[in-house]
């Protein structure tokens, strides 16, 4: 049987029309299918799977083939603990060049004073941010006050006392039910809650918006060392000038987690007081989601934190992933183009179109709409748990995720809502007309779900049903959309057996 690459080249005989990234990608698949068939087939099946669903999980996107190819090379074999030009290993000059370029690109793209590009994930970036703040604002002053040069010089008793003191400092962040993230410290199972005394702030239950006066009141009462702003399920923008003032009034460091909306900052959608960069002391982000890069994280900060961040090893990190840093650099360069700016604006336009259609059809959205890339549907009036809505939409080829809503009585497993996002569909080239169609499909599915409880195991094991007619119609409409907007159209899936 001819290889995937052979068939691709045969179908596109005009060399000027051949895509080098596709050639490289197909060649790598050919090798894996031959040398490690089970792994190769799983990759092919995942490609087929992602091509056969409308990806509407707000935290997911599609990276370019260039980004993917940058991760598949011998850079993965290089150990390079430390920071550029200050490594614990020799022969790192090429990795130094890549990491330096990546950091400089990040600084230029976001207008940051410093950039640390090594974190393996958003969670790692957040952990590094809080550890850097603790080191800079609590540990170092205490060590100096005690008359020592470094923390390693402290006698055991004084070291233990300092650790106890650090754990008493307060961190104020958004609760999980109000749209915050696990790593914002308000979930006790997460390590962040064990590093400081973490306190939550909530959205107003009537408006479902963050109440800055209430946040200021809590901050004034508790005087946190750190004020966290950001979200993973909140459909509006934040005013970072106001949040900065709240932080300054109580003497707190302002840390912004922009993992979800970094691409909207890079693309010039969030500007002025909606752009965290001029106001935050430290900003963390993932490089996937709206940035369309590889899975990874970044920490952007004021200059005073640069030295601490560059000592992430040994603070909390070991060896970085230079092959992923190379891919981050490519994604950041892609985000500096005019096409990316157009993309970022289209992401929000598409989300607003979805919201309009949902509301026109009687569905309730948290906060009454969206100003960013996501929206959350409150399913309470439909009597459909988020878990079942997720399952039923998945069954017709639409990937969303269940999501809690403020004061959610259903808990974090069942939930009373679902979260949807437009980054991936916008990457495929879909626009307002397609969003109308997608929203109408979702409305029809949600309104035709029948929930049946399992009497033996209780309501938590209830299941959803959808008539075959409704399901088949939805699948066909989804297939029609995906047929017009295929993932990686330069790769012919018919050749992927």
Swiss-Prot record:
Keywords: Amino-acid biosynthesis, Cytoplasm, One-carbon metabolism, Pyridoxal phosphate, Transferase. It is found in: Cytoplasm. One of its GO terms (molecular function) is pyridoxal phosphate binding. It is an enzyme of class 2 (transferase). One of its GO terms (cellular component) is cytoplasm. Pfam families: SHMT. Coiled coil: none annotated. The modification N6-(pyridoxal phosphate)lysine is found at residue 289. Belongs to the SHMT family. Homodimer. This is Serine hydroxymethyltransferase. The lineage of its organism: Bacteria, Pseudomonadati, Chlamydiota, Chlamydiia, Chlamydiales.
């Amino acid at each position: 049987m001819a290889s995937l690459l052979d068939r691709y080249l045969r179908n596109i005989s005009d060399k000027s029309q051949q895509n080098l990234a596709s050639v490289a990608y197909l060649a790598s698949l050919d090798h894996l299918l031959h040398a490690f068939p089970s792994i190769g087939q799983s990759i092919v099946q995942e490609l087929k799977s992602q091509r056969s669903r409308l990806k509407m999980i707000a935290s997911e996107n599609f990276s370019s083939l260039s980004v993917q190819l940058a991760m598949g090379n011998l850079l993965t074999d290089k150990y390079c603990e430390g920071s550029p030009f200050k490594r614990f290993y020799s022969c790192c000059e090429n990795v130094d060049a890549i990491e330096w370029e990546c950091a400089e690109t990040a600084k230029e793209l976001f207008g940051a004073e410093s950039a640390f590009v090594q974190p393996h994930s958003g969670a790692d970036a957040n952990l590094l941010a809080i550890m850097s703040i603790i080191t800079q604002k609590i540990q170092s002053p205490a060590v100096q006050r005690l008359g020592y040069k470094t923390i390693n010089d402290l006698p055991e008793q004084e070291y233990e006392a300092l650790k106890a003191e650090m754990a008493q400092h307060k961190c104020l962040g958004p609760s999980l039910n109000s749209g915050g993230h696990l790593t914002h410290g308000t979930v006790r199972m997460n390590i962040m809650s064990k590093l400081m005394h973490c306190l939550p702030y909530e959205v107003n239950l009537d408006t479902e918006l963050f109440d800055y006066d209430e946040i200021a009141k809590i901050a004034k009462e508790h005087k946190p060392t750190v004020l966290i702003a950001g979200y993973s399920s909140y459909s509006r923008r934040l005013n970072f000038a106001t949040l900065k003032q709240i932080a300054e009034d109580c003497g707190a460091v302002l840390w912004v987690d922009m993992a979800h909306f970094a691409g909207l900052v890079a693309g010039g959608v969030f500007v002025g007081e909606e752009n965290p960069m001029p106001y935050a002391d430290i900003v963390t982000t993932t490089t996937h989601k709206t940035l369309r890069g590889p899975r990874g994280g970044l920490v952007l900060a004021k200059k005073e934190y640069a030295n601490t961040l560059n000592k992430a090893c040994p603070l909390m990190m070991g060896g970085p992933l230079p092959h992923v840093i190379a891919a981050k650099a490519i994604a950041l360069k892609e985000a500096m183009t005019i096409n990316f700016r157009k993309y970022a604006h289209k992401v929000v336009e598409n989300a607003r179109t979805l919201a309009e259609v949902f509301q026109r059809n009687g569905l309730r959205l948290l906060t009454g709409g969206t100003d960013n890339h996501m929206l959350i549907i409150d399913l309470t009036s439909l009597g459909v748990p988020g878990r079942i809505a997720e399952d039923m939409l998945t069954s017709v080829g639409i990937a969303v995720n269940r999501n809690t809503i403020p004061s959610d009585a259903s808990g974090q497993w069942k939930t009373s809502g679902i979260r949807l996002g437009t980054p991936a569909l916008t990457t495929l080239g879909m626009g307002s007309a397609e969003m109308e169609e997608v929203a109408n499909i979702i409305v029809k599915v949600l309104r035709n779900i029948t929930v049946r409880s399992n009497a033996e195991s209780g309501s938590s094991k209830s299941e959803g049903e959808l008539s075959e007619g409704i399901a088949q119609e939805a699948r066909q409409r989804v297939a029609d959309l995906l047929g017009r907007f295929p993932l990686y159209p330069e790769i012919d899936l018919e050749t992927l057996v």
